Amino acid sequence: MAQFVFESDLHSLLQLDAPIPNAPPARWQRKAKEAAGPAPSPMRAANRSHSAGRTPGRTPGKSNSKMQTTPSKPGGDRYIPHRSASQMEVASFLLSKENQPDNSQTPTKKEHQKAWALNLNGFDVEEAKILRLSGKPQNAPEGYQNRLKVLYSQKATPGSSRKTCRYIPSLPDRILDAPEIRNDYYLNLVDWSSGNVLAVALDNSVYLWSASSGDILQLLQMEQPGDYVSSVAWIKEGNYLAVGTSSAEVQLWDVQQQKRLRNMTSHSARVGSLCWNSYILSSGSRSGHIHHHDVRVAEHHVATLSGHSQEVCGLRWAPDGRHLASGGNDNLVNVWPSAPGEGGWVPLQTFTQHQGAVKAVAWCPWQSNVLATGGGTSDRHIRIWNVCSGACLSAVDAHSQVCSILWSPHYKELISGHGFAQNQLVIWKYPTMAKVAELKGHTARVLSLTMSPDGATVASAAADETLRLWRCFELDPARRREREKASAAKSSLIHQGIR
């Protein structure tokens, strides 16, 4: 009997269909238990009997609370600042400045620091706002290009950045003969006056050509045999012409009277570059020295600048008269102040990146701290500088000798004259320095460039003994009339006689 019970228990275990003691309930058991729910209470039963005859309006078991909707308009109390108007660097500076002691400064020093801040930052730090409520972000300074400008600026693209489709003649408007012009890279032999008179130095003579009437006049001829004219420069306002000679003289001529007013001798070598700053005439010599002449007084030589070891072949005053740029055969570019500092006449900046002689020197007319320079055959580069920070803003390989650079304020462009191998003039777009056009026609290297007073015509003197006039910056009639009205309203700044 015991054996039968043992076999029966063994058989039931092997079948595996009997419930396992203390095992968790099966899934179907759990579902059935959940569907049955808790035992109904009397209150819940009464409510169920009261609503048994009503059709449910929603899915059973779903909450009858009102659905939340998104408001049609956001609240008016949320402030989102413009990123372009949040100047974090200025904010950090202003916050840290509060903890510093206030050092009293003279009004002159404050004005000087304000000018530096405007040139470096593009805005006045003292008047800058950290966060500003505004409808549109402020425009970038004119001539300034960055990738964020496209993203944050909502204003129309300025004319300097907009692509132009103007017609640029590829042929010169007029060709004049320039016999016996000296083929010397270091000389500055042409200049155009505000009275629309072009002065050209041909060996030992200076000729004047009136662009208005076409008349030609010989102003002077050197007295000593072997002497020649090495530079010419018109005063900005007036009828006076400065002439530099190979005999180290600087002559001053009254063009209307065709009379030499004075002969200034302070250099020891030929004078290859001249430039005016009101009544101050600056002259650069082969000795490497720059002299300032006050043409109003008898003792004209008022300053000597010694920053070059070889000939000074490029000399330009800034439009505001605060800086003088000089380029030399020693591959240097110096930026000088208009007045001596505590240490005397010391350059504010010295640029050494050029690998050749620097004759092409030109200041930007609408940005007084921007300077363009061009190198000779060993360098062949055009470089744009910020003279306040000393940074090189851009550099472009011109693939040939750069003899001269001019700025066009009408179209925000530059034009440069070149030597071998194509002897061409090249127009560049600023600040991208993209090539706009090439003007070819000279059969020898270009020596000098000068621009007409209306800014529409460029005259190029070359070693092929020709003077070519290019109307490459012609204005439309409306803009020309506006410029003529502005020019007529200006009065002359020269009220003192030159003696």
From Swiss-Prot:
Modified residues (N6-acetyllysine): K66
Residue spans of biased composition, Polar residues class: 61-72
Molecular function terms, GO-annotated: anaphase-promoting complex binding; ubiquitin ligase activator activity
Residue positions where Phosphoserine is found in the record: S41, S72, S92, S153, S161
Compartment(s) where it occurs, according to its Swiss-Prot or TrEMBL record: Cytoplasm, Cytoskeleton, Microtubule organizing center, Centrosome; Chromosome, Centromere, Kinetochore; Cytoplasm, Cytoskeleton, Spindle pole
Residues with the Phosphothreonine modification: T70, T106, T157
GO annotation terms (biological process): anaphase-promoting complex-dependent catabolic process; cell division; metaphase/anaphase transition of cell cycle; metaphase/anaphase transition of meiosis I; positive regulation of anaphase-promoting complex-dependent catabolic process; positive regulation of meiotic cell cycle process involved in oocyte maturation; positive regulation of synapse maturation; positive regulation of synaptic plasticity
Alphabetic keyword roster: Acetylation, Cell cycle, Cell division, Centromere, Chromosome, Cytoplasm, Cytoskeleton, Isopeptide bond, Kinetochore, Mitosis, Phosphoprotein, Repeat, Ubl conjugation, Ubl conjugation pathway, WD repeat
Pfam families (alphabetical): WD40_CDC20-Fz
Cellular component, GO annotation: anaphase-promoting complex; centrosome; cytoplasm; kinetochore; spindle pole
Region (Disordered): 20-81
SUPFAM superfamilies with a match to the protein in the record: WD40 repeat-like
UniProt pathway annotation: Protein modification; protein ubiquitination
Family: Belongs to the WD repeat CDC20/Fizzy family.
Function, in words: Substrate-specific adapter of the anaphase promoting complex/cyclosome (APC/C) complex that confers substrate specificity by binding to substrates and targeting them to the APC/C complex for ubiquitination and degradation. Recognizes and binds the destruction box (D box) on protein substrates. Involved in the metaphase/anaphase transition of cell cycle. Is regulated by MAD2L1: in metaphase the MAD2L1-CDC20-APC/C ternary complex is inactive and in anaphase the CDC20-APC/C binary complex is active in degrading substrates.
Complex and partners: Component of a complex with CDC20, CDC27, SPATC1 and TUBG1. Interacts with NEUROD2. Interacts with dimeric MAD2L1 in its closed conformation form. Interacts with BUB1B. The phosphorylated form interacts with APC/C. Interacts with NINL. May interact with MAD2L2. Interacts with CDK5RAP2. Interacts with SIRT2. Interacts with isoform 1 of NEK2. Interacts with HSF1 (via phosphorylated form); this interaction occurs in mitosis in a MAD2L1-dependent manner and prevents PLK1-stimulated degradation of HSF1 by blocking the recruitment of the SCF(BTRC) ubiquitin ligase complex.
Protein name: Cell division cycle protein 20 homolog
Originating species: Sus scrofa
